[in-house]
Amino acid sequence: MKKQISVLVVALMAAAMISGCGKKEEASAPAAAPAPAAAIVVGLDDNFPPMGFRDEKNALVGFDIDLATEAGKRLGAEVTFKPIDWNAKEAELNGKRVDVLWNGLTITEERKANILFTTPYLENRQIIVVLDNSAIKNKAELAGKVLGVQDGSSAVEAVQKDEAIAKSLKELKKFPDNVTALMDLSAGRLDALVVDEVVGRYYTAKKSGEYRVLEENFGTEDYGVGTRKDDTELMGKIDK
């Protein structure tokens, strides 16, 4: 988990339906078997492509799914995935219904109060997506508009930090997931959507000609894997 991964690499891989954790390094001598680890339950939002989502066969797939699965193999632990209400992710984690949060989880100072994070593994931006034929060209032109965000996501905080823009909006509309928000954008019920770049680039590549990404954005952030604050042993293993 030490090296950050390019957000554009993730988006391009997903758009091309290619995913993976990378090639293992060959060892000159057989490595010692890892100490057995307990099963790890991963909490995720299963409507968050390309990091975690369901394919046409309803199987969970995605970049973070592959990373967590590979981590489990290296730890000798069985990994199971549990879709959760992302707005209640901290309650799910600290209520011990899941062991880790691993699905495009942004590291923030507020979340650090309740979550122990790994070293960042991916740099992300909060981008602005509009319809391709929209007259909106920049952030200032969001004034008087309905702007969508996923409830409980870092997009909410990113928009609220920009007080001038936040106060100028007609409405900051919150959705349970980005897929629903994009449907409202396509239907004209939203003027724009603030979303993680990995998600935005995935959909703009998938639906070329329907969406457009503005040059301005709402800032850069880092993704990390989250465990309970007292679960330092598991954190240390994942963070190797």
Enumerate the language-model features and the residues they cover.
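Bacterial lipoprotein signal-peptidase II cleavage site
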Residues: 18-30
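Extended ligand-binding regions for polar small-molecule ligands
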Residues: 24, 65-74, 133-136, 140-141, ...
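Extracytoplasmic small-molecule ligand-binding "clamshell" domains
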Residues: 34-104, 174
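Alpha-to-beta junction loops
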Residues: 76-78, 94-103, 145-146, 177, ...
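A conserved helix-loop-strand patch within extracytoplasmic ligand-binding domains
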Residues: 77, 85-88, 105-109, 113, ...
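Periplasmic-binding protein-like
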Residues: 46, 122-130, 197-239
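Ligand-binding cleft/hinge of the Venus flytrap
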Residues: 52-54, 68-77, 155-175, 204-208
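A ligand-binding cleft/hinge motif common to bilobed small-molecule-binding domains
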Residues: 88, 105-113, 158-163, 184-219
